[in-house]
UniProtKB/Swiss-Prot annotation:
One of its GO terms (molecular function) is ribosome binding. The PRC barrel domain binds ribosomal protein uS19. An accessory protein needed during the final step in the assembly of 30S ribosomal subunit, possibly for assembly of the head region. Essential for efficient processing of 16S rRNA. May be needed both before and after RbfA during the maturation of 16S rRNA. It has affinity for free ribosomal 30S subunits but not for 70S ribosomes. Binds ribosomal protein uS19. GO terms for biological process: ribosomal small subunit biogenesis; rRNA processing. Belongs to the RimM family. The keyword Cytoplasm applies. It comes from Helicobacter pylori (strain Shi470). This is Ribosome maturation factor RimM. One of its GO terms (cellular component) is cytoplasm. Keywords: Chaperone, Cytoplasm, Ribosome biogenesis, rRNA processing. It comes from the Bacteria. It is found in: Cytoplasm. The gene is rimM. Residues 101-180 form the PRC barrel domain.
Amino acid sequence: MVSMLLVGRIGKSVGLNGGLRLHLESDFPECLKKGVKVSVAPLNAFFCTSSFKGYTIHSYEHAKNLLFLETIHTPEKAKELTNLGLFMSEAESKKLCVLKDGEFFYCDLVGLSVVEENETLGKVVEIQRISQIDYFMVETARSLVEKGLAKIFLIPYRDFYIKEILLQDKKITTNNAKTLLENS
């Protein structure tokens, strides 16, 4: 099964030529180039590939958050896509997006263990953006839950909390994250 990544949420139709307002969920708008293959589906369709319908990008105006797809030329056709998600395959995203040193794809961070002072606090199950700050949603290790700590807690993606991300070791080392867990 192809892994799909949410690029944005499609808003209302704009204009008479099938334009779509795009609420970007990605840090890489440069991936939205003419000719790039994308898919549209309900936002909860991550695991139901039959829900995805393929399209090709005609253009994207980042300053206006305006997306045009090659086969959508009327407001009526555009309205059919309102409130759906715009997705791109993980492979296509990684091919088109050039990461700087220290940057990561969300999909590579989900599933990593969170470790502080050689103690596993849990694993990253999701990443959320709240007020321009990314947060790791961490499912707490069972042994810590049994001690009465929260089942889920959030760690801001800030240097104060995140010491190092080691993809090869499948772990994120932290400072001060256990305090967040204890106070959750």
